[in-house]
Amino acid sequence: MHHQWLLLAACFWVIFMFMVASKFITLTFKDPDVYSAKQEFLFLTTMPEVRKLPEEKHIPEELKPTGKELPDSQLVQPLVYMERLELIRNVCRDDALKNLSHTPVSKFVLDRIFVCDKHKILFCQTPKVGNTQWKKVLIVLNGAFSSIEEIPENVVHDHEKNGLPRLSSFSDAEIQKRLKTYFKFFIVRDPFERLISAFKDKFVHNPRFEPWYRHEIAPGIIRKYRRNRTETRGIQFEDFVRYLGDPNHRWLDLQFGDHIIHWVTYVELCAPCEIMYSVIGHHETLEDDAPYILKEAGIDHLVSYPTIPPGITVYNRTKVEHYFLGISKRDIRRLYARFEGDFKLFGYQKPDFLLN
């Protein structure tokens, strides 16, 4: 009996010691698990939400950049140019704007496009948007002069001497081949600011010897559109606006011939809905656009765009307001109605500050 009690006591002692040891083990190793669990919970509740990236926007092959690969710092830049081309495509599809966005690829349009066969480039001329400088670039590329600085100003616009053939000078088959395979571009700026620049250049300052603007075109506009017949001043911007906004302006355009290129719409000049351009540059962002165009055309190692004077490309709303001051809302609205296609195709904001 005594031995049974001793055996029972021994078993009890072993069980007791086992319980103590288990408690010790639990106390010793529980904290790390609790900490780990707390950390895991903290991680799950405080980690920033990873937003699902939007699906990559499908860019048609013809809208993708065609030139060299850009460094990482500039990879975002081509998106701007692709968005410009996509905007044009969308506006071209808008039936409500069809009369303002479409034009036949006529000889008038082909005359505006200059060819650099050596580097497979087509440039559509849009006067009053820095075109003289782009012509100089192409003249050098064609080999007529070795540098931009060597080109005399009177040669730039003399198409018999500057070595720049017009697309219209080729056969139909050659025209189609170049339109399909060459790098094509042109430059735009705010449509109303461009008209102001054209008016100042041709009717106010007239830096080159072009007497026909003051002696033939201006009198023709005044006779037709000046309301006060007794007024003897030279052509005013108001006369110019009435002429451009007149739905029947074309009969005067025919009399003025190719001189109208300085103020007709970009649509009439370059047919952006009919010709698929590679890049559309904007005068307001020319500091970025010019190097990009040269790179995309594969000629950035051969020539540089001339230095751009500070501030010259900035949109000047004050100047626009000044020139349109005193002109009736009716005349301004008619002017906008004609150039609405240009505003929408190239993403320029509607000038409500003039229209309302």
UniProtKB/Swiss-Prot annotation:
Glycans are attached at residues 99, 228, 316. In fetal tissues, it is predominantly expressed in brain, and weakly expressed in lung, kidney and liver. In adult, it is highly expressed in brain, testis, ovary, expressed at intermediate level in heart, pancreas, skeletal muscle, spleen and thymus, and weakly expressed in other tissues. In brain, it is expressed at higher level in the frontal lobe. 3'-phosphoadenylyl sulfate binds at residues 127-133, 189-197. Residues 28-356 are lumenal. Its EC number is 2.8.2.-. It catalyses: 3-O-{beta-D-GlcA-(1->[3)-alpha-D-Xyl-(1->3)-beta-D-GlcA-(1->](n)-4)-beta-D-Xyl-(1->4)-Rib-ol-P-Rib-ol-P-3-beta-D-GalNAc-(1->3)-beta-D-GlcNAc-(1->4)-O-6-P-alpha-D-Man}-L-Thr-[protein] + 3'-phosphoadenylyl sulfate = 3-O-{O-3-S-beta-D-GlcA-(1->[3)-alpha-D-Xyl-(1->3)-beta-D-GlcA-(1->](n)-4)-beta-D-Xyl-(1->4)-Rib-ol-P-Rib-ol-P-3-beta-D-GalNAc-(1->3)-beta-D-GlcNAc-(1->4)-O-6-P-alpha-D-Man}-L-Thr-[protein] + adenosine 3',5'-bisphosphate + H(+); 17beta-estradiol 3-O-(beta-D-glucuronate) + 3'-phosphoadenylyl sulfate = 17beta-estradiol 3-O-(3-sulfo-beta-D-glucuronate) + adenosine 3',5'-bisphosphate + H(+); 17beta-estradiol 3-O-(beta-D-glucuronate) 17-sulfate + 3'-phosphoadenylyl sulfate = 17beta-estradiol 3-O-(3-sulfo-beta-D-glucuronate) 17-sulfate + adenosine 3',5'-bisphosphate + H(+); 17beta-estradiol 17-O-(beta-D-glucuronate) + 3'-phosphoadenylyl sulfate = 17beta-estradiol 17-O-(3-sulfo-beta-D-glucuronate) + adenosine 3',5'-bisphosphate + H(+). The chain crosses the membrane at residues 7-27. It is a single-pass type II membrane protein. InterPro entries: Carb_sulfotrans_8-10, Sulfotransferase. One of its GO terms (cellular component) is Golgi membrane. Pathway: Steroid metabolism; Protein modification; carbohydrate sulfation. Residues 1-6 are cytoplasmic. Changing residue 197 to A/T: Loss of function. It is an enzyme of class 2 (transferase). Keywords: Carbohydrate metabolism, Glycoprotein, Golgi apparatus, Lipid metabolism, Membrane, Signal-anchor, Steroid metabolism, Transferase, Transmembrane, Transmembrane helix. Changing residue 189 to A/K: Loss of function. Its main location: Golgi. Belongs to the sulfotransferase 2 family. Catalyzes the transfer of sulfate from 3'-phosphoadenylyl sulfate (PAPS) to position 3 of terminal glucuronic acid of both protein- and lipid-linked oligosaccharides. Participates in biosynthesis of HNK-1 carbohydrate structure 3-O-sulfo-beta-D-GlcA-(1->3)-beta-D-Gal-(1->4)-D-GlcNAc-R, a sulfated glucuronyl-lactosaminyl residue carried by many neural recognition molecules, which is involved in cell interactions during ontogenetic development and in synaptic plasticity in the adult. May be indirectly involved in synapse plasticity of the hippocampus, via its role in HNK-1 biosynthesis. This is Carbohydrate sulfotransferase 10.
